[in-house]
Amino acid sequence: MADGNYGIVHQDSPDRRGIDVALLYRKDCFELLEADFLRLSFPEDTTIRTRDILYASGVLDSDTLHFFVCHFPSMIGGEKQSEWRRERAASTVRHKVDSLLAVQPRAGIVIMGDLNGKANTPAQKVLGTKSSDKKPRCKDLYNT
């Protein structure tokens, strides 16, 4: 990989297990424009420490793309009991997506990673994704 001209976007997250998110990219194919780590906070329970959400944008083949690299909070403590944490993560992503779409309605957005749930969970509903068999429309997110 050292010869591949790769770049990486990474920072240590507050996760106690040392799990982080990162974006690995080829510098000769993708021009990184911006990177930010969205910190998830849980004032209701300050003992919760989870992975940040990585937001990065860049240019690929003259198109600007926006990436969200996610590893939503785990189901520790039970799926239903911990769902609100994943909903908070989804809400954080959705808020940033909405702010991007307000400026650029046809923005190319990719949300990827481990969302710790199925397509029909409450957290997925917060994201507002639609089935990928629907006709694409601006400002919609699709599951694939």
Q: Whereabouts are the PLM-identified features?
A:
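Extracytoplasmic/periplasmic, Sec-exported soluble proteins
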Residues: 1, 12-16, 45-48, 81-89, ...
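Structured beta-strand-rich core segments of catalytic domains in phosphoester-bond hydrolases
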Residues: 1-64, 72
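Active-site environment of divalent metal-dependent phosphoester hydrolases
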Residues: 16-18, 75-77, 116-122
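Active-site His/acidic residue clusters
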Residues: 63, 68-85
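Secondary-structure boundary elements
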Residues: 30-31, 58-66, 95-106
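Metal-dependent phosphoesterases centered on the DNase I-like endonuclease/exonuclease/phosphatase
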Residues: 86-144
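Short, well-ordered secondary-structure micro-motifs
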Residues: 4-5, 79, 121-124
